[in-house]
Amino acid sequence: MAIDENKQKALAAALGQIEKQFGKGSIMRLGEDRSMDVETISTGSLSLDIALGAGGLPMGRIVEIYGPESSGKTTLTLQVIAAAQREGKTCAFIDAEHALDPIYAKKLGVDIDNLLCSQPDTGEQALEICDALTRSGAVDVIIVDSVAALTPKAEIEGEIGDSHMGLAARMMSQAMRKLAGNLKSSNTLLIFINQIRMKIGVMFGNPETTTGGNALKFYASVRLDIRRIGSVKNGEEVVGSETRVKVVKNKVAAPFKQAEFQIMYGEGINTYGELIDLGVKHKLVEKAGAWYSYNGDKIGQGKANATIYLKEHPEVATELDKKLREMLLHNAGEFNSAASDYEDNENEEMNNEEF
């Protein structure tokens, strides 16, 4: 028993020393019924927020979004920016592809007047800008579009046809080591958009891979695979695309969940259509034949009319969104300092001794 008490005192002293040297919260104790309270930003899609488990993309972490061309990668990140700006957060867009369309971004709800934008010349410059913005502590969301366009300086200064084996992978590996800690301390969300490449000579298994080496795969807390799986038509005219997002990796909740939603051309994610579908699935919206009803009131005949009703009555849409989030998302608990627990125990013992 005396040995246990000595161990407890030694541990309390060690924890106190660590926190004194490295700051409060530098070492934590995971209680049995506690989980880390991760702050998140909505993706703009309710079904994807639910699939992610935490209610959105986690702050202070690295996220990778990859998929084929025209699958909705940039659209999804612009929706994240719009959602973050609505919460009063500061966002930056590192446009390495030099292809950002400000008119389209504005249509998706992005406040382009307050969006920081950079079009770097080299990959090193892009990543240094990311690091500088992160260390400032004043930027909440940074988007890099895309990893494939982060060209090392040596490759740009060289000639076409020169061999530059592993340069991009080495550059990304160094950047990840430098950025990861800074992102956590400044609580900045860094999203990398990535492209797909094919491995040569793969006979079995998935031949697809992403650019930039393996470092990003390891450092990313969330990896999203986004694919276009169909078209949305209005008569004969194609007005959007059916999109599926798979959570390939998730360090803040259970992975491998999927979300399906529509991306409408010129409008972005069809959030009202998602509310109708999820409302029907979880019995918050009643469907009788072609008619949709909410709280006993008919809101439209057919999904298109029900969607229009929600568009015209945003207070109803907000109420339905809130109910679905409360039903489908779990709130995380508190995450306390280990040293403070021992300090509390010691204080209690001292108080008991006084009496």
Curated annotation (Swiss-Prot):
Binding site for ATP: 67-74
Superkingdom, natural source: Bacteria
Main location per the UniProt record: cytoplasm
GO BP: DNA recombination; DNA repair; SOS response
SMART domains the record matches: AAA
Acidic residues bias: start-end ranges: 341-355
SUPFAM superfamilies found in the cross-reference section: P-loop containing nucleoside triphosphate hydrolases (SSF52540), RecA protein, C-terminal domain (SSF54752)
Coiled-coil features, chain-numbered ranges: none
S-S bridge residues: none
GO CC, one annotated term: cytosol
Localization: Cytoplasm
Keywords: ATP-binding, Cytoplasm, DNA damage, DNA recombination, DNA repair, DNA-binding, Nucleotide-binding, SOS response
Positions of region (Disordered): 336-355
Family: Belongs to the RecA family.
PANTHER family per the UniProt record, alphabetical: MITOCHONDRIAL DNA REPAIR PROTEIN RECA HOMOLOG-RELATED (PTHR45900:SF1), RECA (PTHR45900)
Record's protein name: Protein RecA
Lineage: Bacteria, Pseudomonadati, Pseudomonadota, Gammaproteobacteria, Enterobacterales
